[in-house]
Amino acid sequence: MGSSSSYRTGAVLVIIACVFFALNGIVAKIAIDGGLSPISVAAVRTVGSALCLLPFVVLVWRRFTRAMLPPMIAYAAIGIFASQALYFQTLSYLDVALALVLVYIAPLPIAIYQHVRRGERLPRYAYVVMVVAIGGVTLSVLGGGGGVGAVSIIGVCFGLATMITFAAMVILSARQPAQLGSMGRAGAPMIVAAVLYLFVVPPWAFPYDKLDDVVMLAGRFPLEVPLWTTLVWIVVLGSVVPFSLVLAGNARVGSGAASMLGMTEPVVGSIAAWVILGQLLTLVQIVGILITVVAVAIVEHARTRFIHEVELPGMLPPLADGNPR
């Protein structure tokens, strides 16, 4: 009875985290549309998260060795710095739902990598379902009513690039030092990524004058808020809180189940983008997103069932250490 209750609690925690992560993309979209550059939003999220995680890194500082640096730097540069920058850049060109569905096909290249590089095979049906997932993505991207001309090709390219960096993040996460613990594994590369962002967006170059500007939600509930509040959300409710929920949820349900539950994020993000931003999808796009989510969930279920070395995090954008998202 206790075990069942613990599992339900963990599932609820992971789903709540998915809701926060989905809303984070929407809030980031508002900040970008409000005048901040995508790279500035990414920098705020990373630096803010790094500051929140810094105390946990200090606690395990003595466990660090020089051998940990190469995989940690690679993870920070590709899995955090590049993926965050590319994801927010994607949001500047595409609707939130399309950005999420592009990123969430990451299990496909991960499975292919494990097949080609490690010889780890999935059941045949999983490879068939991969093709179905690609078809679903095609419907969601091109089904907006205007065909290819109605969607930003640049945005799609950024989305696919984000997906590749996310897949790389998952693969690299398996090489992060376990002796640092979950918070240490998440915090150390986050700090490295934050340092990289400080070179790209130095504090003196940040557009502080825009922070008091007012931005408006354009959905069913029009609301004006100061721009700075979106950044507070992105760091606290879009990063630190959901990440903590993921850690607590993973401990109860396991990373495999958390990964499956994480597939609710594109669906939640699509609905929330409609309500909050007024971003409408066509019936074809809705069908495409649902096909993609179900297909990727099937592939991920097969992957976590037959292959255990690399576990896909349950939500995006990446904050956690491969367990995440």
Regions found by a protein language model. Name each.
Residues 53, 122-144, 284-303:
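Hydrophobic transmembrane alpha-helices of multi-pass small-molecule transport proteins
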Residues 40-51, 87-130, 162, 255-274:
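Specific alpha-helical transmembrane segments that line the substrate/conduction pathway
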Residues 8-12, 39-55, 74, 126-135, ...:
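Hydrophobic alpha-helical transmembrane segments of multi-pass integral membrane proteins
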Residues 22-23, 47-51, 108, 134, ...:
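Small-residue-rich packing faces within the transmembrane alpha-helices of Major Facilitator Superfamily
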Residues 1-44, 148-175, 183, 199, ...:
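Glycine-/small-residue-enriched transmembrane alpha-helix faces in small-molecule transporters
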Residues 20-25, 54-103, 139, 235-253:
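Specific transmembrane alpha-helical segments of multi-pass solute transporters/efflux pumps
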Residues 44, 84, 99-105, 172-195, ...:
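Helix-helix packing/entry segments at the starts of transmembrane helices
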Residues 1-3, 12, 46, 227-229, ...:
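C-terminal-most transmembrane helix of multi-pass membrane proteins
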